[in-house]
Swiss-Prot record:
Protein name: Hydroxysteroid dehydrogenase-like protein 2
Bias (Low complexity): 301-391
Enzyme class: oxidoreductase
Gene3D superfamilies named in the record: NAD(P)-binding Rossmann-like Domain (3.40.50.720), SCP2 sterol-binding domain (3.30.1050.10)
Residues that bear N6-succinyllysine: 424
Organism from which the protein derives: Rattus norvegicus
Domain of life: Eukaryota
Length: 524
């Protein structure tokens, strides 16, 4: 871990949400240098599930070598914020560092998020950060080591981070936008930065979100405390940065990050908002964004007669040069389409449409019978034999992948049933011995229902309804996402992080199922 250097001795650090978790860890790290800590948090009485109050935190800070000032602060209340700032200045003579750590979270989609919860997240995350910063800035400007640090993510506009928890993302990005604006506004006077973990951090909030056993996939709060300490040591010129904890600690010479793991060597859960796990992120993006749009574009070329009957598409020589396709607004507005050059080449190299079996893996496309008939692609070579003779082989039927049998046109229930059939065929006594778990799947949406996968009974069992033995893990998701997950198009980790998959029960056994899925993907 990062050693203390005494750099913060005598500095006053104002931390919101410092009674427990990450806020308290940062406070204790600074206290070891002899810093003055203002504990700005709500909790004054012990909670049966949430350990720690502003007073117990003050005792720990004093024991670590710092001086503590516990203040009752709800960051939604501007008067409480201003009162705490006044007390801090009166007690310690000023404020040198502000840590905006207080946060509210609800990983629910738009229709499932009550207005009251939306207001809470906006008020605590965005408004609370803004008001606390505003109250502290006049005093920070007088400090020689002035820092504002927001616990917020990089501004990543990948739609996957908005889709399943739009309100939370907006509220959290509001904190990040404070960094973006204030860093420039107070450049040369105050260093303003954001800090975000690469992996999940074990806190009370994570226990509530992930359930029992999630801690083994997390790192300790110490990694955030060390990263924050590294930032505080830097000059005011170090500003406007969106910092990942692991990256800045690597700069400090930390190489072994197992020291921060709750369970060293155990796979870690990636945190939200980071596209730093390319395989997982691309699988997730394909599961709802670029691939469906690509397929819709192709289906329009095949199914909408007006596109094929337009004489300019057949007669204009520009078709071979494809300026129109490159200039179409809808293609340019979709960055993911620009990343797939084969989309521009497909009118000349139509066989690529058949080389992408994943197009048939999407249930919504198979529900359109036109895709099976495909009369238009057979007519195109006849209409333009001189321009594209290479298209003549296109109508020849291609071998269908095994997934075609998993995804019948209708209904989704059939896809789920067929998926379980193939899963059953993939089981063995060896798999059962290695897993020893019963999984229950609560599938929502069209033709949803309850299914189970029993990997405790000899040979393994699958079926519709609840298992005979109590399930060790209950997974809730949409039927469509279930099929994608078992066919390898959607990784369980990313489904969980994006809110598509909800897990109750033993997380370690859920991870075992993910490994089993990887093994079965070759058959699915």
């Amino acid at each position: 871990m990062l050693p203390n250097t005494g750099k913060l001795a005598g500095c006053t650090v104002f931390i919101t949400g410092a009674s427990r978790g990450i806020g308290k860890a940062i406070a204790l790290k600074a206290a070891k240098d002899g810093a003055n800590i203002v504990i700005a948090a709500k909790t004054t009485q012990r909670h049966p599930k949430l350990l720690g109050t502003i007073y117990t935190a003050a005792e720990e800070i004093e024991a670590a070598g710092g001086k503590a000032l516990p203040c009752v602060v709800d960051v939604r209340d501007e008067q409480q914020i201003n009162s705490a700032v006044e007390k801090a200045v009166e007690r310690f003579g000023g404020i040198d560092i502000l840590v905006n750590n207080a946060s509210a979270i609800s990983l629910t989609n738009t229709l499932e998020t009550p207005t009251k919860r939306v207001d809470l997240m906006m008020s605590v995350n965005t408004r609370g950060t803004y008001l606390t910063s505003k109250a502290c800035i006049p005093f920070l400007k007088k400090s020689k080591v002035a820092h504002i640090l927001n616990l917020s993510p990089p501004l990543n506009l990948n739609p996957m981070w908005f889709k399943q928890h739009c309100a939370y993302t907006i509220a959290k990005y509001g904190m990040s936008m404070c960094v973006l604006g204030m860093a420039e506004e107070f450049r040369g006077e105050i260093a303003v930065n954001a800090l975000w973990p690469r992996t999940a951090i074990h806190t009370a909030a994570m226990d509530m979100l992930g359930g029992a056993g999630v801690e083994s996939q997390c790192r300790k709060v110490d990694i955030i405390a060390d990263a924050a300490y590294s930032i505080f040591k830097r000059p005011k010129s170090f500003t406007g940065n969106f910092i990942i904890d692991e990256n800045i600690l690597k700069e400090e010479g930390i190489k072994d990050f197992d020291i921060y793991a709750i369970t060293p060597g155990h796979p870690l859960l990636p945190d939200f908002f980071l596209d730093e796990h390319p395989d997982a992120v691309m699988e997730e993006k394909e599961s709802y964004d670029p691939v469906p749009e690509v397929k819709e574009e192709k289906l329009q070329l095949q199914e909408q007669p007006q596109l094929q009957e337009q004489p300019q598409l057949q007669e204009k020589p520009q078709l071979q040069e494809q300026p129109q396709l490159q200039e179409k607004p809808q293609l340019q507005e979709q960055p993911q389409l620009q990343e797939q050059p084969q989309l521009q080449e497909q009118p000349q190299q139509q066989p690529q449409l058949q080389e992408q079996p994943q197009l048939q893996e999407k249930p919504q496309l198979q529900e359109q019978p036109q895709q099976q008939e495909k009369p238009q692609p057979q007519q195109q070579p006849q209409q333009q034999p001189q321009q594209r003779p290479q298209q003549r082989p296109q109508p020849q039927p291609q071998p269908q992948p095994l997934l075609q049998s998993v995804l019948p046109p209708k209904p989704h229930f059939g896809a789920v049933e067929e998926t379980f059939r193939i899963v059953k065929d993939s089981l063995s006594d060896e798999v059962v011995r290695a897993t020893q778990a019963v999984y229950q799947f609560e599938l929502s949406g069209e033709d949803g229902g309850t299914w189970f996968l029993d990997l405790k009974s000899k040979g393994g069992k699958v079926g519709h309804g609840e298992p005979s033995d109590r399930a060790d893990v209950v997974m809730s998701m949409a039927t469509e996402d279930f099929v994608k997950m078992f066919s390898g198009k959607l990784k369980p980790t990313m489904a969980f992080m994006s809110g598509k998959l909800k897990i109750k029960g033993n997380i370690a056994l859920a991870i075992k199922l993910e490994k089993l899925m990887t093994h079965m993907n070759s058959r699915l």
